[in-house]
Amino acid sequence: MDVEGAFADEEELAPHGGWASADFDPAEFGYEDSDDDFDAEDFDETEFSNPDFGEDYSDEDWEEIETAFGFDPSHLEEALCTVAIVGRPNVGKSTLVNRFIGRREAVVEDFPGVTRDRISYISDWGGHRFWVQDTGGWDPNVKGIHASIAQQAEVAMSTADVIVFVVDTKVGITETDSVMAAKLLRSEVPVILVANKFDSDSQWADMAEFYSLGLGDPYPVSAQHGRGGADVLDKVLELFPEEPRSKSIVEGPRRVALVGKPNVGKSSLLNKFAGETRSVVDNVAGTTVDPVDSLIQLDQKLWKFVDTAGLRKKVKTASGHEYYASLRTHGAIDAAELCVLLIDSSEPITEQDQRVLAMITDAGKALVIAFNKWDLMDEDRRIDLDRELDLQLAHVPWAKRINISAKTGRALQRLEPAMLEALDNWDRRISTGQLNTWLREAIAANPPPMRGGRLPRVLFATQASTQPPVIVLFTTGFLEAGYRRYLERKFRERFGFEGTPVRIAVRVRERRGKGGNKQ
């Protein structure tokens, strides 16, 4: 998202969007349609069908083949520079982060210590993409949770390509500011000094003392009112190195949507995680109407949960607040990276459950299915549920299933590992060499069926994207849906990918006539 407008006014910023394309669009993945048959004339079809094809190929060789077929995988390997926003507690770091990324993601409250983790967000300024890293308030004389926060800030300082050191114009220099400035002066990383809360030109006189920190000219900024940040971003881009120091940053916190039909226990689960009554909970279906974002620290990570109202009726037949709650549930799924689908295990699986599941898979989101109210199960119901799973959830065998009780806390500790595994696979990429080794073996075991009197050849495979994983097969003819399902099954047998949909897309390479024209 381009954030240049973030410093122009106080309008509502756009929320985080989600990828929900169900159809394969070559333009989305860097393919170029051309009249030269993908510029792949150097490759003979018989070469691709050779069982030994590609065995001794290097990564560079596979990249040449991908390029010949019109595919540029560089967007999957994009390495971005990082700017870390550091400073003592309550100087306005998270507000500045929100300005830098052009949307309200970082948590902003008017008391110290709100940001407890080192969290990264993607920003786009002047056509350049980079990471903006929000940190907790740094203080050298703290213990407990605040010591952990300070440690996260130090890690950010050690891995960032540029550091923005934020001080408070209204408060002036504190002892913590001086200690931190001395630490930054010893660092080899470029530092930009930002004097935040510069809300009036009458404060120019207050800027003078910040020169004593030894970090150069302070940039007067009002993050709250969107003033001065553009100059800081221009300077950040100027100071970025050609290659980033760290290439292993993941945007976070990861976004989770709790979804399911009304009264299935979404709010109860959220409250159990949060340890507080975050949402109004009642046995009346549809108690929670609006999604409520909650940042919650579980055992391993900080997560952003969205608690939704649930779908009582189909959107077309719902009325009033139910209609808008349904629309918001769609929005929550689109905005999430991972969906936890809650199903009431004590009742038969319903059409509503199936409908919400279809929304998730159509949107291409990572998925964990939580069978709630397990404390109400008896032996007869368990037998019935096993039968329902075989009939109604057979199309998502890849989804992790956890039996829980949000009321008693049963097995809730198993949810986070399942969520992490699903997201790891949602983000995962298989090398082109591994893909084509698997493809040769799968085709040798079961060749594609004849179509129109001709046997289609599968020439080559590459992974076009992640989130969700999309595998593109270049072929000489169309592949039947049943054969694509076979390939997906063999793909999962080899590589796993539990917890995420995997899309198998086919791109037919049309044959040329002897004169070089397509037939």
UniProtKB/Swiss-Prot annotation:
Residues 1-54 are annotated as: Disordered. GO terms for biological process: ribosome biogenesis. GO terms for molecular function: GTP binding; ribosome binding. GTP 2 binds at residues 260-267, 307-311, 372-375. GTPase that plays an essential role in the late steps of ribosome biogenesis. Associates with the 50S ribosomal subunit. HAMAP family: GTPase_Der (MF_00195). This is GTPase Der. It comes from Corynebacterium glutamicum (strain ATCC 13032 / DSM 20300 / JCM 1318 / BCRC 11384 / CCUG 27702 / LMG 3730 / NBRC 12168 / NCIMB 10025 / NRRL B-2784 / 534). The lineage of its organism: Bacteria, Bacillati, Actinomycetota, Actinomycetes, Mycobacteriales.
